[in-house]
Structure formats: C-alpha cells, structure tokens
Amino acid sequence: MQCDNEEEYDYVIVGGGPTGLALAQVLSLSLKRVLLVEKRDYLGGCHGVTRVHDGMMTEHGPRIYIDNFLMFTQLLNDMGVQFDDLFVKYNFSTATMMLEALRVLTVREIATLVWSFMTLNDSFKETTLMEYLSSHGFSNAAIDIFDRIGRLTDGGSADTYTLFSFLQILNQNFLYGIYQPRVPNDVGLFRIWEDTLMKRGVSIMKNAAIDRFIVGNASDASDASDASDASADAKAKVVSGIVLRDSRAESRPIVCGCKRVILACPPQEVQRILSAHSELGAAFGPGFDRFQQETQYLPYISVIFHWRSALRVPTIWGYPRTSWGVGNIVLSDYMEFNDPRSKTVISAVVTMPDRPSELLKLSANDIGDKRGVMREVFRQLKQIYPDLPEPDYQFLTQSAYDAASRRWVPFNHAFMTTTHGHVPNQSVLYDNLYNCGVQNGNSSYSFTSMESSVANAVHLATELQPELRLRGLRVVKVREAITVRAVVAAAIVCVGVACTGFAMHKRNRGRVK
C-alpha cells in the first residue's frame, strides 16, 4: 500500500486494468500526482494473471494481441519496450477464421457478405449480426458458425454482436498478424508497466477497498462570493476525496483528497461501485444501469490445464466447435513458463455455458461443481486433440458458482459493443467524476481489446490535460493503418487509372495513323 494518510492527489484512478494503467502512464507525463487503486492483488484486469497452487498460472482467457494495436504500441515505446519484445506470432490468423466460415457458406451467402463488406458504413452499428443473417436468408449452419466466431473473438453472440463490428474483423485485422505473450503477463507486460509507473511517481494501492467517496458542493472549495452563483445546479457537485482501506486485514482507513476521480472500469464494475456507494447517486444518469446490463460481455468460464511433460499437441486452431463451445490456445507453443510443472499448458474457455453437452445433456451452468465442469471441458478438448493424456493440474479460478441463479459468474467483466452504443465520460452529477473504458467509444478499433482500452484512456487524458497534445500524444486511429477496404479502394483506383491511361494511349495512336 502506497497511499499516505490524508494525501492529496490530482487524480485518483479506480481500476488497475489496461485503461487505468494507460491513464496513469499518460497523466504522469503532465507531472500530476496520480493514485492508482486496484481491488485485487494484481494489475491487468481481464488481461491479468492469477497465481494458484504455489505460483501456477491461471488467466481469464485465452487472449490475443494484434500488431495493428497502434496506440498500445506507442505506450510500449514510451516505456522503452518494443511490441516484439513481449509478443510472438500466433500460428493462426484472421484468414484462418474466414476459411472456417467458408466451409459452410453458399456462393449466394458469400456474395451477400462481400457486398455488405464493400458498403460497410455506420448504419451497420444499429443492426445485430443475427438480424442481418436472418433477414438475408443465411442457413442455420452459417448462423451457428458466425455465432461461435463472435463468441470467441469479441465476447458476443450473434444476437448481440453488431454487423459493423463483425465486418470490421476482416477489414481491420485481415492484413495483420495475431500474437501471443512470450511470458505470462505478470512476468512481462504488467511488471514492466508497474515498474514504469513507480519510477514516474505514480502511487499504486492494490488490495484496496473503497469505504466511501467524499462528496460536496464545488462552492465549498471556492470563494464565498461564488457560492451564491447557481450552486444549486447539479453540476456544482464534486467528489473531493476517497476513503480507502486494505481489504486483507483490519486497518485504519486512509483519506485521499483529489481534484478528479476516474472510474477506469467496464460499465458493470462502475455500476457495482455506484450501487455500493449511495453517496454517488445516479452519477452517470438514470439509464446507466440498464446500459450496463445490455452491454455485458458473455459470462465465459475459463479453465487452464498444465502437464509436467512437453506434449506434441497438433497445430489446430482452437475454434469453439464443441457442444459447450470450448475454444482454446496452446499457450506453451508461445510462452516460456519457467516452471517444470508447466511444460505443456492449454488455456480453454467455455463460450456457450447454457448449451447442453451432447454426452451429459447438461450445460456448464447446470453443473455447480468445478471438478465436474473441468472434467467435461477436458473431454470436449479431447475431441479436438484426441491423444491428450490426463492433465497433471487443472484450474477453474476466474468464476464462482451462484447457486441461486444456477450459473457461473466471472470475477472479471468487460464491455461488449452492441446496438446500444456508448456513454460519455463525464458524470451528470459531479464536475470532476468520470468513467473511462471501451464503453466511451473513443477508439476507431472496433473490438473490446487492449487497443480500444488504452485508446479510450489516452483520449480522456488529453481532454483533461490538453497540453499532452503538445507532446505529440494523440489517439492513433486504426484507419491510419492499412485496412482491407483501403487496399481494395486503392486497387480500384489503380485499375481505373490504368484503364484510362490505356484508353487514351489507344486513342492517341489512332490519331497518329
């Protein structure tokens, strides 16, 4: 814990995931006093690593990274690190995914998709993938495969995924490589990130529990002459501090005064904070609770398997083709674990927890026992890799079973872009309270990812501290990279120019004759 009692900060950032880390990194460049607050004992949010059984790795995964993460790469460079230092090329690509889909699509369905891709526009953000596929007569097999791809790539089913986001998978990612971390993120990425913040004077408090927010009127901190100037307006309210304590033990509360508070969390976590602290009220408007319910990432169940021996696992894309939609990545093909118990490691995820197993006739949510779920996940994994021996270790650590609702509830949450759009950063009640994350829509990258998280953070930081733009810091737009549509458009222009030139040349030759 590094927050001194009754300290004053320019910024208190709640949430130690990629958004919070990026905010702290960028705001520290303005020489502001920053406190980063994280409720867990590790940083990274959904990208973080949980250690169990004397240091064995588990994760909320599997996760991927792409080399068109331009803003993320810029932040890495600011930390003195290159993208390739931390990540290695994945054995599969966006083309792998498209080829999987082409196996079941008819010529008519392919032509329909191509036309929609070439006419891609913002109106597609108002249409779900299911609405599009159903209205254009796609087969059940096509709908099923697109639903499974959506669940694997961006945490959404066909009835929540927007048509715009789905087509952007191809447009923004097809020409780029997919990567995996070279080492677990707590050893690589987040250790480097934390060290950088510490060197720049950012205070970091892990295992932090929020006792309360200190709220009042802006006029309390201003001259009495200003107090009579419409201070009854809701916008005159401010959050002047936050009271924290160490969640691991009974400890004296720590009062941290602040000029601004940023909840760097997905909407579900922001709403949890609002519900737990009535002093904040409906800080982001009366419709925020409904918004967070309608934009929730699918409740995945992550399971990880470790073997003491180095196995020859076939190179097969971990597409969720099984009855529970079990997807996977063989992490040991890419990561160095430096642990004799982890010579082979497969990270698996149940993307369809409500679908029944063809063997058990039960869904994952019907089974409230960890061992029962892990046993069935491994059985379905063997449908992909038939020669897998029984694992030496297996863990389900990222979810807990809620017996009342009969479902596995993940510890980590994320935002899913749906037809319900995005929300603004600033509170409607408090001048100095903000939420920040993918839910704000200030990234041209269409997916819930490391890139969209940090891009939204940089956008807010430069809004709050405009002088950062003078340092050349700005949100890099994905459209500044090469996309498939840009290449196609350029090719059409080139062909048009060539045809025009050929026609003119032919006409001129005719005149000479």
Show where each model-derived region lies.
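N-terminal Rossmann-like FAD-binding beta1-loop-alpha1 element of flavoenzymes
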Residues: 9-36
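Short hydrophobic core segments
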Residues: 12-14, 37, 210, 254-270
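Glycine-rich FAD pyrophosphate-binding loop
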Residues: 28-53
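Glycine-rich active-site loop/strand segments that organize a redox cofactor
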Residues: 44-68
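Mobile amphipathic helical/loop "lid" adjacent to a hydrophobic cofactor/ligand pocket
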Residues: 72-163, 171-175
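Helical element adjacent to the flavin cofactor pocket in flavoenzyme catalytic cores
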Residues: 168-217, 233-259
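C-terminal segments that line or cap access tunnels to active or ligand-binding sites in enzymes
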Residues: 179, 258-260, 265-410, 429-430, ...
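C-terminal lid/capping helical subdomain adjacent to the catalytic/cofactor pocket in oxidative enzymes
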Residues: 413-513
